[in-house]
Each structure stands twice: as structure tokens, then as C-alpha cells.
UniProtKB/Swiss-Prot annotation:
It is found in: Secreted, Extracellular space. InterPro entries: Di-copper_centre_dom_sf, Hemocyanin/hexamerin, Hemocyanin/hexamerin_mid_dom, Hemocyanin_C, Hemocyanin_C_sf, Hemocyanin_N, Hemocyanin_N_sf, Ig_E-set. Hemolymph. The keyword Nucleotidyltransferase does not apply. Disulfide bonds join C529-C577. The keyword Membrane does not apply. GO terms for cellular component: extracellular region. Keywords: Copper, Disulfide bond, Glycoprotein, Metal-binding, Oxygen transport, Secreted, Transport. Hemocyanins are copper-containing oxygen carriers occurring freely dissolved in the hemolymph of many mollusks and arthropods. This is Hemocyanin E chain. The gene is HCE. Signal peptide: none annotated. One of its GO terms (molecular function) is chloride ion binding.
Length: 624
């Protein structure tokens, strides 16, 4: 079957998911699907909730093992009529992304499938009215602002509510499902636990950089399960349930749920910390297994999330996942009022809530306790023999000054919402963006021949919220990765130039459904997992916020991974998302060299000849 026909059939699967379905008679439903439908339609699905995730896993395994593409589509069409809407989209997306006969097929962007998860209720209500008043024409409405200056977090709405960042979080959890069974699926998810740690750690670092950009103090991590939480209102209404995502008033605390109680959360945290302090964990058979320096953080990632690969779920529990569920349900913990949960229940909405970042910094601090037990890097560990980084500059309109600004974009609503006509209904909104820039890295190679190296680029704030110079260890967990790539150095002097658009952290904007319909997919492989390109760097401020650009060069011969091909699929954003069906393409720990505690009190003590630290400024302007 031609790819265009396949693409059109996939598009039809997800269209108007917010509309009511007409159930099929049971005798017309494949027997493999008869046990599904336990989570009713109209409820909010959560991939953090064990029962929801269990049913979703059953469905994606059925679809994944279907004999051919036609059977996948037929099974999906049948299941759509009675399976929960959110669960359906999650499970079908996982199956399609991983089937060999779906290569080149693009799953429609989650923001077009469920625009109600990204667009405020007030804006959708306005769009509905405009479409009803003008049924014979295309409609465009501007997004309605839902916050105000009484809430300090409103300054960060451009970051927390960004369509691309929230879609990234949803897509990452589709690429890395917590229940992924490598033996059953026949595909590896290499270093999945470490990726869970690193991707979320980087989101927290980026959030703190945005706070500093807006003159705010760095976040205060969530610290105990009895503390009172800040309030939050998402101004989102689920069109599947007809109910708003729950509002959280100031001062509420977490409560026991029917599925889990707070005492278990305390126990799980203490058991994980005990494993870190003792240097070993207890596996399913009760054996003590050492947390080794190579795989320790990967093991901890699986324990904390927890994923299928957790070593002892009964003992170490599911600290991360149940934390999300508890945060989402604290305003109606026993479900007596039949309210929707809050946005923390869903991967496509949770980034909007400030507690997401505080809770993930709490999770990250557990990882940091483990990192503190690892040996520090020596100067030899941070030196690439024969390679000297002479100078690094950022080439923008003004050297070493990158300008950011707000840019208008649009989101189509009519694919996800049935407005009763064939006309387009769009929301116009603004997102952060930045001017194009390149890195110019001057390097001397005295090794005596051509040398393959890995270039690693990071950005970190220079000062804290009080204007104090950050020490290397303070800055370490605030550094954000910008790029990581292979380069070949000729003997002598070299200048390596790298365009920011080639970053291995980011992906371009998702392909609109309209374009998919017209072109039948995209040329080559588009994997969608990655941080949005327009959010690569923080906002900065009007004066020009001081950052430091770190570049370290390492020996590619020591970094290269056996079994990872140069032509691997889905490598456009390997730093956060890995490579499809292959080993993670870098032997170094994720975040190297900032994955270990830094001893030196000054950067002069930390830097080696193979590293560079350059002052750069990020300047925000109201005019593009």
C-alpha cells in the first residue's frame, strides 16, 4: 500500500476524538479486544495510573502484534468505538511509532488531536461561537490570556504553557512507555532509566533558567509529603469529559488515595535512599545487587519512575508515577465529588503546573544524592589528548549576544473538534523564539593526525537571583545541553562551525495534519521526539542576561558505541530521546561532564585545555 494511503488511514483514526462514538455490537468486535473498555469513555486517562496504563499496554501490544497494517487499522477502528479516548490515542500512538510497516507514517500531533489540552477554555469557547456565527468561512481567534500579575508564575506562562514543550513531554512518554517490555516487543530502549532522569533534569534546569530570566528566585523543591502546596488553575476543560481540569486552591496537602497512601510514598523514598547510601539495591529475589558506576543511574531511573524494568517494584514502589496521581487528585482524593483530576495526571498538560517542576526537582535531588557518591572527574578525565580549545564565539547579529522575542503561530482546532463545517478554525498564539546563530569553535589538534572528536555544548546562568557569581557546583545542575555532535579535526588549527538548527536536542515544529493530508507524510524519518527548536535557549532579559557557554571536546574513539550505525533512524534529537531501536549513541554518561559533583570553587580549577567557557548574553526584545 502506498505511504500516502497509509498516512490518510492513520489520520482518520484520530479525527474528532472529542466527539461521541457509536459503539459496535459485541459480535462485530474482534475477540482480542473483548476484555478492554475497563476505563470508561469520558474519563481522563493517565499513563501515571497503574490500572489505566495496564489497559493501554494490553491494547498497544495487540496492535503491535497484528499481522499487517490493514489489521492494525481494523483493530484500532473497532477499539475506538468503546475504548477510553485518551487511552486509545496513547496506545495506538505507541503501536504505530514502533511497527516496521509504519515507517514514514506520522502520528498526528497531540495538540491537533486534543487541542483542549493546550488551548484555554475561554479561547475554545470563543472559537465555537465564531464558527457558529460564520459557518461558511475560515475562522481565526487569538488566544485569551487567563492569568494576571497577582500570580508571579504568570511571568512564566510562555514557558509552562508552550504548545511545543508540552507536546514534547507527551511524545517522550510515547517513545518511552513505562511498561515497555523489550522481550515482548523485540526492541531495545537502551539506558531508558537514565534518559528518564536526564530529560526531566534538563526540563527543571530550563525552568530555573527561565525563572532567573524573569527576575525570580530559583524554585524551592518539593521536600515532604505533608507540605502545603501552592494553588494553580489551568483554565483547561476536557471536551472528552465535559469537565474542567481541577483547580487547586492554595494550602492543600496530599492525601491518601484508595489506590495508595502517603505512608507508602514515605517508605518508597526511604528505601530508595537506603539503596543509594548502602550502594546496593534489593532485587526481586531478595539479593543485594551493587549499584555500579556504569549502570547505577539507569537502575535508579527504572526504580524511581517506576518502569517495567524496575528491579523490585513490590519493594521500591512507584514514587514518580503515584506522585503525579496524588498531585492531580489532592482536591478530591476519594472522588466523592466526581471531579476531573488536575493537569498533573497527563503528560501533555502537567508542564503547565508549577508543582511539576518542584516535584521533579525533588525526584532529581534523589538522583543527585547518588551522583554525590560517585568519584569526581580528574583533569585527565576531562582532557582530550592533543586537543586544545582555543576560543569559542557565538555568531549572531551581535557577536556573543543572542536576541529572543515572541513570535506568532497558529494551531488548527477543526481536526480535534467537530465544528459542524469543513472550514478551518485556528487559534493564533505567541511563543518564544530566537534569532539564528552559529557556534564558531577554534581548536588546535596536535595529535599528529586527523582526529575524530565529540563536541559538547552547554549553557548556564552566570549569576544567581541576588546577583552573586554561581560557583561551578551550584551552576552544574542549572546547565542546559544545547548540542552534541561528531567533528573531524585536521592536524593543526581548525575552526568548527555549527548551526543551532542542527542541535541534537531539538526538533522542528510538528507537521500539521493539513500538510500530512496533502503530501501523504514527510520525506525521510520524522520521529517528533525532542525539545522544540524555538525553545532551545532561555528568554533572557531586556538588559541582556549573562550566561556562560561551555564547550568540551572528547575523544570520539572513546565515545563511540558498538552497534550504533551512522545511519540510525530518529537521531534528530538523540540527547533527550536516544536513537530508535539502537543503543544510546554515546558511551559517556548523559550530561557529561556535569553528571558528577565539581570540587573546584572556581572555574579555573575545573577547566582543562580541552574545555572552554565563554561569556554570552541573551537579550529579550519586544520587537522581532
Amino acid at each position: 500500500m502506498p505511504d500516502k494511503q497509509k498516512q490518510l488511514r492513520v489520520i482518520s483514526l484520530f479525527e474528532h476524538m472529542t466527539s461521541i462514538n457509536t459503539p459496535l455490537p459485541r459480535d462485530q468486535i474482534d475477540a482480542r479486544l473483548h476484555h478492554l473498555g475497563r476505563l470508561p469513555q469520558g474519563e481522563l486517562f493517565s499513563c501515571f495510573h497503574e490500572e489505566d496504563l495496564e489497559e493501554a499496554t494490553e491494547l498497544y501490544k495487540i496492535l503491535y502484534t497484528a499481522k499487517d497494517f490493514d489489521e492494525v487499522i481494523n483493530l484500532a477502528k473497532q477499539s475506538r468505538t468503546f475504548v477510553n479516548e485518551g487511552l486509545f490515542v496513547y496506545a495506538v500512538s505507541v503501536a504505530l511509532l514502533h511497527r516496521d510497516d509504519c515507517k514514514g507514517i506520522v502520528v498526528p500531533a497531540i495538540q491537533e488531536i486534543f487541542p483542549d489540552r493546550f488551548v484555554p477554555t475561554e479561547t475554545i469557547n470563543l472559537a465555537v461561537k465564531e464558527a457558529a456565527n460564520h459557518p461558511d468561512q475560515d475562522i481565526s481567534v487569538h488566544v485569551v490570556e487567563t492569568g494576571n500579575i497577582l500570580d508571579e508564575e504568570y511571568k512564566l506562562a510562555y514557558f509552562k504553557e508552550d504548545v511545543g514543550t508540552n507536546a514534547h513531554h507527551w511524545h517522550w512518554h510515547i517513545v518511552y512507555p513505562a511498561t515497555w517490555d523489550p522481550a515482548f516487543m523485540g526492541r531495545m530502549k537502551d539506558r531508558k532509566g537514565e534518559l528518564f532522569y536526564y530529560m526531566h533534569q534538563q526540563m527543571c534546569a530550563r525552568y530555573d533558567c527561565e525563572r532567573l530570566s524573569n527576575g525570580m528566585r530559583r524554585m524551592i523543591p518539593f521536600s515532604n509529603f505533608d507540605e502545603k502546596l501552592e494553588g494553580y488553575s489551568a483554565h483547561l476543560t476536557s471536551l472528552v469529559s465535559g469537565l474542567p481540569y481541577a483547580f487547586r486552591p492554595d494550602g492543600l496537602c496530599l492525601h491518601d488515595l484508595k489506590d495508595i497512601d502517603l505512608k507508602e510514598m514515605f517508605r518508597w523514598r526511604e528505601r530508595i535512599l537506603d539503596a543509594i547510601d548502602s550502594g546496593y539495591y534489593i532485587d526481586n529475589e531478595g539479593h543485594q545487587v551493587k549499584l555500579d558506576i556504569v549502570d547505577g543511574i539507569n537502575v535508579l531511573g527504572a526504580l524511581i519512575e517506576s518502569s517495567f524494568e524496575t528491579k523490585n517494584k513490590l519493594y521500591y514502589g512507584s514514587l514518580h508515577n503515584w506522585g503525579h496521581v496524588m498531585m492531580a487528585r489532592l482536591q478530591d482524593p476519594d472522588h466523592r465529588f466526581n471531579e476531573n483530576p488536575g493537569v498533573m495526571s497527563d503528560t501533555s498538560t502537567s508542564l503547565r503546573d508549577p508543582i511539576f517542576y518542584r516535584y521533579h526537582r525533588f525526584i532529581d535531588n534523589i538522583f543527585q544524592k547518588y551522583i554525590a557518591t560517585l568519584p569526581h572527574y580528574t583533569p585527565e578525565d576531562l582532557t582530550c589528548p592533543g586537543v586544545h580549545v582555543v576560543n569559542v564565539t557565538v555568531n549572531a547579529k551581535v557577536p556573543n549576544v543572542v536576541t529572543t522575542f515572541m513570535k506568532e503561530a497558529e494551531l488548527e482546532l477543526s481536526y480535534g473538534i467537530d465544528f459542524g463545517s469543513d472550514h478551518s478554525v485556528k487559534v493564533l498564539y505567541r511563543h518564544l523564539d530566537h534569532e539564528p546563530f552559529t557556534y564558531n569553535i577554534s581548536v588546535e589538534n596536535s595529535s599528529g593526525g586527523a582526529k575524530d572528536v565529540t563536541m559538547r555544548i552547554f549553557l548556564g546562568p552566570k549569576y544567581d537571583e541576588l546577583g552573586n557569581r554561581l560557583q561551578p557546583e551550584q551552576q552544574r545542575t542549572l546547565n542546559i545541553e544545547l548540542d552534541k555532535f561528531k567533528a573531524t579535526l585536521d592536524p593543526g588549527k581548525n575552526v568548527v562551525t555549527r548551526d543551532h538548527r542542527n542541535s541534537t536536542v531539538t526538533v522542528e515544529q510538528s507537521v500539521p495534519v493539513k500538510k500530512l493530508r496533502e503530501e501523504g507524510g514527510v520525506a525521510g524519518e520524522y520521529c517528533s521526539c525532542g525539545w522544540p527548536e524555538h525553545m532551545l535557549i532561555p528568554k533572557g532579559n531586556h538588559r541582556g542576561m549573562d550566561f556562560e557557554l561551555f564547550v568540551i571536546v572528547t575523544d570520539y574513539a572513546q565515545d563511540a558505541v558498538n552497534g550504533h550505525g551512522e545511519n540510525a533512524e530518529c537521531v534528530d534529537a538523540v540527547s533527550y530521546c536516544g536513537a530508535k531501536d539502537q543503543k544510546y549513541p554515546d558511551k559517556k554518561p548523559m550530561g557529561f561532564p556535569f553528571d558528577r559533583v565539581i570540587e573546584g570553587l572556581t572555574f579555573e580549577e575545573f577547566l582543562t585545555v580541552s574545555m572552554s567557557c565563554t561569556d554570552v548574553r541573551i537579550k529579550y526584545t519586544d520587537i522581532k
